[in-house]
Amino acid sequence: MDFFNKFSQGLAESSTPKSSIYYSEEKDPDTKKDEAIEIGLKSQESYYQRQLREQLARDNMTVASRQPIQPLQPTIHITPQPVPTATPAPILLPSSTVPTPKPRQQTNTSSDMSNLFDWLSEDTDAPASSLLPALTPSNAVQDIISKFNKDQKTTTPPSTQPSQTLPTTTCTQQSDGNISCTTPTVTPPQPPIVATVCTPTPTGGTVCTTAQQNPNPGAASQQNLDDMALKDLMSNVERDMHQLQAETNDLVTNVYDAREYTRRAIDQILQLVKGFERFQK
């Protein structure tokens, strides 16, 4: 990751050389560092999201490839027995001997029927899911999420600037298997508030005092009239009064100049009128 940050930083510096006419201003080192960290975090986030997508696809393919095992149906072998045919009784002759009857052939029908009854008495209502092998849930997705959250916490160094904080994305896996990532919103710094207070003076003028208040508590240029010392406040008012007096003097001088110019113009017009009257006489 350090190599990627150095590579991105070197690429940004080489793409905008100082000798270029389009180069306006060199960025602050802290800003460059924050941008490099943000680029690294975004690359990590995209990398882990790609890992999660690939792992979920592999898990789905593994589950889809496992088909339920069909239960084995017992095979019953029943040996057909020959139907005994009635044989006529032998005719006993005086000179013949009685034939000895052959022993009756034994069959195994009773054993086959007992096997059939045993199979039928078994519980055949067992669900097909019980015949499937026990599936052990894969912990690869949870491992990737844990590693991503750990890297989010360890790779973010404490910034020396308290004015800006980079957002950190946190991913969690829900009970239904879905993955949700949340990124907190960072409020940008507000522009400073400039207020001007004008107070009329007994001489007819106006004294205006301008104060700048920054909503950021860590800014060094924050100025609040409530926290300002009385000596500083009086010096600011005195300075504004001197400036106002100088502007008033300039205005009065301009008015006097305008009045003198107007008087001379009127005198010239009167002289022209008198000369025109003399010419008519």
Swiss-Prot record:
Compositional bias segments (type: Basic and acidic residues): 24-33
A GO CC annotation recorded here is: host cell endoplasmic reticulum-Golgi intermediate compartment membrane
Where is this chain primarily localised?
A: virion
Q: Which UniProt keywords apply?
A: Host membrane, Late protein, Membrane, Virion
Q: Where is the composition biased (Low complexity)?
A: 154-175
Give the induction annotation.
Answer: Expressed in the late phase of the viral replicative cycle.
Give the highest taxon in the source lineage: Viruses
Span list, region Disordered: 1-33, 93-112, 149-188
UniProt-annotated location(s): Virion; Host endoplasmic reticulum-Golgi intermediate compartment membrane
| Processing after translation | Its phosphorylation state is regulated by the OPG054 kinase and the OPG106 phosphatase.
**Compositionally biased, Polar residues: which spans?**
1-22, 94-112
Pfam families (UniProt xref): Orthopox_A5L
- Role played: Component of the virion core. Participates in virion assembly.
Q: How does it assemble?
A: Interacts with OPG136 and its cleaved form.
Q: Which family does it belong to?
A: Belongs to the orthopoxvirus OPG130 family.
List the protein's name.
Answer: 39kDa core protein OPG130
